[in-house]
Amino acid sequence: TNRDRFDELQYRLTQLVPHIKSIALPRGENQTFSIELVDRYSEHHIPASDISDGTLRILAFLTALYQENTPSIICFEELENGVHPWLLHKMMELLKIVSTEGITGKPVQVLITTHSPVLLNYVEPHQVRAVELDKEGKTQVHKLPIDSVRFQKALEAYDGALGELWFTNVFGGNPE
């Protein structure tokens, strides 16, 4: 039910942002609702206009995952913006569940754009596509060369830290 999804979204939000106790949706004029987050310690209702960008992005992220009619694909542009790296790791763990099991038992394809080496450290090389412009100004998308000896040696040298490996330009995606 919608209530179950809301409760799960609220639970996930409180796990990701521990100082939040709950979500309040006070009714305004003309049957509109506003979003307020309830502080765990003071019980103060914080209007959306006073909530940090990172917390709002996490709320939007969760809303996309827990919407009523789960789509077959969900896209996030620069998921890392405004989000603490520890929270980003937790969000990526949730996305792994969503992409393999789904929220309602149906896996969802997840597409994320990023410029973050931190985020790259949370994914497997076979899940990454590098995007760059060629010399004619056309966008090129390619898989990482995971079968190449050069790539494997470089990945091993960086202890599997794909984000750090990105700086070596061994798989592209860097402006030149």
Regions found by a protein language model. Name each.
Residues 12-15, 164, 171-176:
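Feature primarily recognizes SF3-like P-loop helicase cores of small DNA viruses
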Residues 19-22, 27-168:
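Switch/communication elements of ASCE P-loop NTPase nucleotide-binding domains
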Residues 1-27:
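Amphipathic alpha-helical domain-onset/packing element
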